[in-house]
A protein has these predicted regions:
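Conserved beta-strand-loop-alpha-helix junction that forms the acyl-donor binding cleft
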Residues: 137-147, 163-167
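Short alpha-helical
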Residues: 14-18, 39, 144-145, 166
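Conserved acetyl-CoA-binding loop-helix of GNAT-fold acetyltransferases
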Residues: 106, 112-125, 148-152
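Terminal substrate-recognition subdomain of acyl/acetyltransferases
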Residues: 2, 162-175
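Conserved GNAT acetyl-CoA-binding A-motif
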Residues: 120, 127-138
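Acetyl-CoA-dependent GNAT
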Residues: 13, 24-109, 120-121
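A short beta-loop-alpha structural element at the N-terminal edge
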Residues: 6-21
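Conserved acetyl-CoA-binding loop of GNAT-fold acetyltransferases
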Residues: 151-160
Length: 175
């Protein structure tokens, strides 16, 4: 008997290496703005220290009778706290306080299954639980796949910026 279950949970210290592998597997993929040093263990530890890193676990029962299970992290998202992003003048003061969702990653084997959207929904719900009025994030202007994925949520494009050597569109949405 095979059974598959996916769930989104807060990441733990034990997940650090697997999350780092998930980030690194994104490098070199089309439109990925990340480099060898970002995101790295520093960002993972920063996010864990603020209880702001969440992962989707794909749990697949190998043998239900024996109770053995193999869990795998297939996606991650962070609630970021980046002063450079927060200082951008495009964010609406009427929607303050707002927070940024970032470092969204989906394992290549699980892409095109709407997992990124599920992670965004979870992230927005978590921000609302924490008392934020809005969510904002940056998307590389050339990342057509991400732009398409985010379009279904009705985010407002509130500006453009160049940070970290990348051209970004600035998105914001009331929660």
């Amino acid at each position: 008997m095979r059974n598959r279950m996916r769930k989104i949970v807060a990441a733990t210290e034990e997940n650090k290496e697997e999350i780092l592998k998930l980030y690194k597997i994104q490098l070199g993929r089309e439109f990925c703005p990340w480099g060898d040093s970002y995101p790295g263990m520093k960002e993972i530890e920063f996010d864990l220290g603020r209880e702001s890193l969440f992962v989707m676990i794909d749990g697949q029962e190998i043998n239900a009778d024996a109770g053995s299970k193999e869990d795998r992290i297939i996606a991650a998202i962070s609630i970021d706290d980046d002063p450079q992003v927060e200082r951008l003048d495009c964010w609406s003061s009427r929607l303050a306080p707002g927070a940024e969702l970032s470092r969204l990653a989906v394992h290549p084997d699980f892409q095109n299954q709407k997992i990124a959207r599920q992670m965004l929904v979870f992230g927005m719900e978590e921000l609302a639980r924490r008392g934020y009025k809005s969510v904002h994030f940056l998307v590389n202007k050339l990342n057509v796949k991400a732009l398409r994925s985010y379009a279904v949520f009705g985010f407002d494009t509130v500006g453009e910026c160049s940070l970290f050597g990348q051209p970004f569109l600035c998105y914001e949405k009331s929660l």
